[in-house]
Amino acid sequence: MRFYNTLTRDVDEFKEMNSGRINMFVCGPTVQDHFHIGHARTYIFFDAVAKLLRNLGYSVFYLQNITDIDDKIINKAREMNIQPQDVADMYLREFLEDMSALKVTSVNYFAKSTLYINEIISQISRLIEKGYAYETSDGVYFEVSKFADYGQLSNQSLDQIIHGYRVAVNENKRNPEDFVLWKKRKPGEPYWDSPWGPGRPGWHIEDTAITETYFGPEYDIHGGGSDLIFPHHEAEIAQMRAISGRKYLSHYWIHTGMINVNNEKMSKSLKNFVTIREVLKEYRPEDLRYALLNANYRTQLDFSKGLLEESRKQVEYLNSTFRKLVNASGNSDLSADPSAVIKRMVDEATNDFDFRSVFRDLIDFAGDLNKNIESISRPAAQKAIDVFRWVDSFAGILLPETARLSGIIDDLLDLRKNLRTERKFQEADRIRDLLLKNGIHVEDRGDETIWW
């Protein structure tokens, strides 16, 4: 498997740190507003990646943080005249509902930042001890100039960063590029006790505290949107490597491209901000997954109604073909070798996650099938179904009603097979008769059972 690594700016062969196991962290959202299609692109993509890796035999621990304390959350709470924690809780529920609706089901654990205050304080204390951080009257800051590799991920020199910095002057900081680790308490804001007085964590330190808790100082894959490369991911690297003294925080960095809407940058000011929920009022989750995965994940994507309409057509075509396969009961074999099709798709999916080529091959395969799909034999149809299921296992493009029927039948036949093995023939026959009553024929051919 090979994919583009932002850290090396090249397509690298992947080698996990521990054989067969992958630790993957993806930056989660700040829960302070409705979630948009930019979020959808990132989280659908990494959902597909995690599921693909598991299909390939890896044990993947997929960790995602939830930023539940932040300036934006505090400002939103003031606008709504409620507590910041109420804002965070409300939008976290919405986020999890959106992810469930989009079939994003691969995350092992969502870690809320406020549950890791002790770990955050520990990291800041170690950075101060090692001379990388300093306290001021308004907080604790990381001194960027002390970390020689700052800018490596974003391909900038420290001089470029310093000269290009455009921030409001803060006389408490030694240098304008230094970033905050701990913000001392302001009236009316949430706070936690710390060695530097009551306050709250900075954004960057939250993620490294969480990843160190679960993965230690070094792990396999870090992902997120390309807008996070600088300064957020750059800061994460500086923090953890300054503490650990190691060469890596994450060995591989994967970033998704930004989204334009009708050829314009998506933003609230342009009033072209498209939320996940708005899209799902008109389109199915499978349509959106297809649209967002059917493009190079690193490129900028132009999002439009036309894109969704085309994706809906393709999803319907593939699902229609799948339903025909479920009902196939002829005598013909397949013109294409399903195992060869899957092998080609595996090669494409593991070559920088080229899901677009996988979809193209599935469309071509469906085209071949539809030339004589009514005459395809049951065993041949089952092999073709395996191709669709393999793609769906990470892409999530089969409609629930389409996938459910085939899955339920196979589960029942597995149960029947076990009953026959245990010589419980009466119970096995009841399953066969139940299926027949619902128009599904079951036939045993030696060690193989087919249905139509």
Swiss-Prot record:
Tell me which Gene Ontology terms the entry assigns under biological process.
Answer: cysteinyl-tRNA aminoacylation
UniProt keywords, alphabetically: Aminoacyl-tRNA synthetase, ATP-binding, Cytoplasm, Ligase, Metal-binding, Nucleotide-binding, Protein biosynthesis, Zinc
Q: What does the record note about the cofactor?
A: Binds 1 zinc ion per subunit.
MF terms in GO: ATP binding; cysteine-tRNA ligase activity; metal ion binding
Q: Its principal location?
A: cytoplasm
Residue numbers covered by motif 'HIGH' region:
29-39
Task: Give the enzyme's EC designation.
Answer: 6.1.1.16
Q: Which domain of life is it from?
A: Archaea
GO CC terms in record: cytoplasm
Q: Which reactions is this enzyme annotated as catalysing?
A: tRNA(Cys) + L-cysteine + ATP = L-cysteinyl-tRNA(Cys) + AMP + diphosphate
Q: Give binding positions for Zn(2+).
A: 27, 207, 232, 236
By sequence similarity, the record places it as follows: Belongs to the class-I aminoacyl-tRNA synthetase family.
Task: Quote the protein name from its UniProt record.
Answer: Cysteine--tRNA ligase
Organism the protein comes from: Thermoplasma acidophilum (strain ATCC 25905 / DSM 1728 / JCM 9062 / NBRC 15155 / AMRC-C165)
- Gene, per the UniProt record: cysS
